[in-house]
Amino acid sequence: MKKTAAIISACMLTFALSACSGSNYVMHTNDGRTIVSDGKPQTDNDTGMISYKDANGNKQQINRTDVKEMVELDQ
């Protein structure tokens, strides 16, 4: 039941953020999380980190090896 609620919450967050201006990207991690970024994430090839701005406008980083898939949301 908790897994279903988490999936529904992630979908709702994705649709809510897709209404914002600009291109948003969704990153699916290896541990099952879904991260929605505001704008296109930047990959640093030297460090292997992906930098992105989260839904609250805070800059975040995640290791590239932790990201399974990254796709642009359709507007």
Curated annotation (Swiss-Prot):
Q: Which coarse location class applies to the principal site listed for this UniProt protein? A: membrane
Q: Give the keywords, sorted.
A: Cell membrane, Lipoprotein, Membrane, Palmitate, Signal
Membrane-topology descriptor = Lipid-anchor
Family matches, as Pfam families: DUF903 (PF06004)
Q: Which family does it belong to?
A: To E.coli YgdR.
The family database entries (NCBIfam families) matched by this protein are listed as:
lipo_YgdI_YgdR
Name used for this protein in its record: Uncharacterized lipoprotein YgdI
What organism is recorded for this protein? Escherichia coli (strain K12)
